[in-house]
Amino acid sequence: MSHVPTAGTVPYPQTAAVVLAGGLSSRLGQDKARLRLPAQDGHSLLERTRQLALHFVPHCWTSCRSARQRDCEADVLVDFMPGCGPAGGIYTALTRAAGQGFRDILVLPCDLPFLDEITLQRLFLTHATAPPQTLLTAYAAAESGRMEALVGIYAVTALPFFAKALQEGQRAVRDIIPARHQNLIFYTSADSRPFLNLNTPEDLHTVKSLLASCR
Protein backbone atom coordinates (compact mmCIF):
# COMPACT_ATOMS: atom_id res chain seq x y z
CA MET A 1 0.00 0.00 0.00
CA SER A 2 1.33 3.43 -0.88
CA HIS A 3 2.12 5.78 2.00
CA VAL A 4 2.84 8.79 -0.19
CA PRO A 5 0.74 11.68 1.18
CA THR A 6 -1.34 14.19 -0.67
CA ALA A 7 0.74 16.75 -2.53
CA GLY A 8 1.17 19.94 -0.53
CA THR A 9 1.59 18.30 2.87
CA VAL A 10 5.37 18.68 2.62
CA PRO A 11 7.53 20.14 -0.16
CA TYR A 12 8.61 16.74 -1.50
CA PRO A 13 5.85 14.18 -0.85
CA GLN A 14 7.26 11.57 -3.24
CA THR A 15 10.50 11.32 -1.27
CA ALA A 16 11.15 9.47 1.98
CA ALA A 17 14.26 9.88 4.13
CA VAL A 18 16.58 7.55 5.97
CA VAL A 19 19.11 8.54 8.62
CA LEU A 20 22.03 6.13 8.79
CA ALA A 21 22.70 5.33 12.44
CA GLY A 22 24.04 1.80 12.34
CA GLY A 23 27.71 2.51 12.89
CA LEU A 24 29.69 1.25 15.86
CA SER A 25 31.10 4.70 16.77
CA SER A 26 34.23 2.85 17.89
CA ARG A 27 36.64 5.71 17.19
CA LEU A 28 34.49 8.23 19.04
CA GLY A 29 34.05 5.95 22.04
CA GLN A 30 30.33 6.68 22.46
CA ASP A 31 27.15 6.36 20.43
CA LYS A 32 27.29 9.42 18.17
CA ALA A 33 23.60 9.13 17.26
CA ARG A 34 22.58 9.78 20.88
CA LEU A 35 25.11 12.56 21.40
CA ARG A 36 23.69 15.90 22.51
CA LEU A 37 25.68 19.00 21.67
CA PRO A 38 25.50 22.54 23.07
CA ALA A 39 23.34 25.09 21.25
CA GLN A 40 21.26 22.41 19.49
CA ASP A 41 18.08 22.62 21.59
CA GLY A 42 18.87 19.51 23.59
CA HIS A 43 18.23 17.15 20.68
CA SER A 44 20.45 14.19 19.95
CA LEU A 45 22.30 14.23 16.65
CA LEU A 46 19.93 11.55 15.38
CA GLU A 47 16.78 13.41 16.35
CA ARG A 48 18.12 16.70 14.98
CA THR A 49 18.81 15.04 11.63
CA ARG A 50 15.40 13.37 11.55
CA GLN A 51 13.63 16.66 12.24
CA LEU A 52 15.66 18.37 9.54
CA ALA A 53 14.64 15.72 7.01
CA LEU A 54 10.98 15.95 8.01
CA HIS A 55 10.93 19.62 7.04
CA PHE A 56 11.05 18.35 3.46
CA VAL A 57 9.61 14.83 3.31
CA PRO A 58 6.66 12.99 4.86
CA HIS A 59 8.48 10.05 6.39
CA CYS A 60 11.91 9.35 7.87
CA TRP A 61 13.36 6.00 8.88
CA THR A 62 16.35 5.31 11.11
CA SER A 63 18.68 2.72 9.62
CA CYS A 64 20.23 0.33 12.15
CA ARG A 65 22.29 -2.83 12.04
CA SER A 66 20.03 -4.60 14.58
CA ALA A 67 16.65 -4.14 16.24
CA ARG A 68 18.23 -3.84 19.70
CA GLN A 69 20.35 -0.88 18.65
CA ARG A 70 17.37 1.48 18.55
CA ASP A 71 14.86 -0.51 20.60
CA CYS A 72 13.24 2.60 22.05
CA GLU A 73 12.76 4.50 18.81
CA ALA A 74 10.10 4.36 16.13
CA ASP A 75 10.49 3.98 12.37
CA VAL A 76 13.55 1.77 12.61
CA LEU A 77 14.79 -0.11 9.55
CA VAL A 78 17.01 -3.09 10.34
CA ASP A 79 19.41 -3.95 7.52
CA PHE A 80 18.20 -6.77 5.28
CA MET A 81 21.82 -7.71 4.68
CA PRO A 82 23.76 -7.27 7.95
CA GLY A 83 27.41 -6.34 7.90
CA CYS A 84 27.27 -4.30 4.70
CA GLY A 85 27.67 -0.87 6.29
CA PRO A 86 25.89 2.20 4.87
CA ALA A 87 25.36 0.44 1.53
CA GLY A 88 23.22 -2.14 3.30
CA GLY A 89 21.21 0.58 5.01
CA ILE A 90 20.57 2.39 1.74
CA TYR A 91 19.61 -0.86 0.02
CA THR A 92 17.10 -1.60 2.79
CA ALA A 93 15.64 1.91 2.63
CA LEU A 94 15.35 1.83 -1.17
CA THR A 95 13.54 -1.49 -0.95
CA ARG A 96 11.10 -0.20 1.64
CA ALA A 97 10.56 3.07 -0.22
CA ALA A 98 9.83 1.27 -3.49
CA GLY A 99 7.32 -0.95 -1.71
CA GLN A 100 5.52 2.05 -0.25
CA GLY A 101 5.26 4.02 -3.48
CA PHE A 102 7.96 6.61 -2.95
CA ARG A 103 10.02 7.78 -5.92
CA ASP A 104 13.23 8.80 -4.13
CA ILE A 105 14.95 8.61 -0.77
CA LEU A 106 16.94 11.31 0.95
CA VAL A 107 19.95 9.67 2.60
CA LEU A 108 21.64 11.38 5.54
CA PRO A 109 24.22 10.29 8.12
CA CYS A 110 23.47 10.92 11.79
CA ASP A 111 26.75 12.71 12.53
CA LEU A 112 26.65 16.04 10.70
CA PRO A 113 25.95 18.64 13.41
CA PHE A 114 26.14 21.59 10.99
CA LEU A 115 23.90 20.20 8.25
CA ASP A 116 21.18 22.77 7.59
CA GLU A 117 17.99 23.43 5.65
CA ILE A 118 19.75 25.54 3.03
CA THR A 119 22.05 22.65 2.14
CA LEU A 120 19.13 20.23 1.83
CA GLN A 121 16.99 22.69 -0.11
CA ARG A 122 19.73 23.10 -2.69
CA LEU A 123 20.01 19.33 -2.93
CA PHE A 124 16.29 18.94 -3.59
CA LEU A 125 16.13 21.78 -6.12
CA THR A 126 19.09 20.38 -8.03
CA HIS A 127 17.60 16.90 -8.05
CA ALA A 128 14.27 18.23 -9.32
CA THR A 129 15.96 19.63 -12.45
CA ALA A 130 18.42 16.78 -12.99
CA PRO A 131 18.71 14.93 -16.33
CA PRO A 132 16.26 12.03 -16.67
CA GLN A 133 18.97 9.39 -16.34
CA THR A 134 19.94 10.65 -12.87
CA LEU A 135 19.80 8.08 -10.07
CA LEU A 136 21.75 10.09 -7.51
CA THR A 137 22.09 13.77 -6.70
CA ALA A 138 24.81 14.44 -4.15
CA TYR A 139 27.39 16.95 -3.01
CA ALA A 140 31.09 16.67 -3.86
CA ALA A 141 34.19 18.59 -2.77
CA ALA A 142 35.37 20.85 -5.59
CA GLU A 143 39.05 20.55 -4.67
CA SER A 144 39.25 16.75 -4.43
CA GLY A 145 36.18 15.63 -6.36
CA ARG A 146 35.28 13.37 -3.43
CA MET A 147 31.56 12.73 -3.38
CA GLU A 148 29.49 12.96 -0.21
CA ALA A 149 27.58 9.80 -1.07
CA LEU A 150 25.80 9.76 2.29
CA VAL A 151 24.25 13.19 1.73
CA GLY A 152 22.21 12.55 -1.35
CA ILE A 153 18.92 11.80 -3.01
CA TYR A 154 18.69 8.35 -4.58
CA ALA A 155 15.98 7.30 -7.01
CA VAL A 156 14.33 4.00 -6.08
CA THR A 157 15.28 2.87 -9.58
CA ALA A 158 18.86 2.74 -8.25
CA LEU A 159 17.89 -0.40 -6.32
CA PRO A 160 19.29 -2.90 -8.89
CA PHE A 161 22.71 -1.23 -8.68
CA PHE A 162 22.76 -1.69 -4.91
CA ALA A 163 21.53 -5.27 -5.12
CA LYS A 164 24.25 -6.15 -7.62
CA ALA A 165 26.96 -4.36 -5.64
CA LEU A 166 26.10 -6.09 -2.39
CA GLN A 167 25.91 -9.48 -4.06
CA GLU A 168 29.42 -8.86 -5.42
CA GLY A 169 30.79 -7.67 -2.08
CA GLN A 170 31.01 -3.99 -3.05
CA ARG A 171 30.58 -1.83 0.06
CA ALA A 172 31.84 1.62 -1.00
CA VAL A 173 28.66 3.62 -1.57
CA ARG A 174 30.33 6.24 -3.78
CA ASP A 175 31.31 3.51 -6.28
CA ILE A 176 27.88 1.90 -6.65
CA ILE A 177 26.11 4.38 -8.93
CA PRO A 178 27.92 4.88 -12.28
CA ALA A 179 29.08 8.42 -13.04
CA ARG A 180 26.66 8.75 -15.95
CA HIS A 181 23.79 8.45 -13.45
CA GLN A 182 25.21 10.96 -10.95
CA ASN A 183 24.30 14.63 -10.66
CA LEU A 184 26.84 16.38 -8.44
CA ILE A 185 26.78 19.71 -6.62
CA PHE A 186 30.30 20.94 -5.98
CA TYR A 187 31.19 22.89 -2.86
CA THR A 188 34.43 24.64 -1.91
CA SER A 189 36.39 24.30 1.32
CA ALA A 190 34.90 27.62 2.41
CA ASP A 191 31.44 26.04 2.27
CA SER A 192 32.35 22.68 3.77
CA ARG A 193 31.06 23.11 7.32
CA PRO A 194 27.73 21.29 6.73
CA PHE A 195 29.76 18.18 5.88
CA LEU A 196 31.95 18.22 9.00
CA ASN A 197 31.28 14.90 10.71
CA LEU A 198 32.05 13.30 14.04
CA ASN A 199 34.33 10.29 14.02
CA THR A 200 36.90 10.91 16.75
CA PRO A 201 37.22 12.73 20.09
CA GLU A 202 39.26 15.35 18.22
CA ASP A 203 36.33 15.90 15.85
CA LEU A 204 34.02 16.31 18.83
CA HIS A 205 36.33 18.92 20.37
CA THR A 206 36.42 20.83 17.06
CA VAL A 207 32.63 20.77 16.75
CA LYS A 208 32.10 21.96 20.32
CA SER A 209 34.56 24.80 19.77
CA LEU A 210 32.80 25.87 16.58
CA LEU A 211 29.40 25.74 18.27
CA ALA A 212 30.71 27.83 21.15
CA SER A 213 32.06 30.44 18.73
CA CYS A 214 28.62 30.74 17.10
CA ARG A 215 26.84 31.73 20.30
Predicted regions located by residue number:
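Nucleotide and nucleotide-moiety/phosphate-recognizing core
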Residues: 3-170, 178-194, 201-214
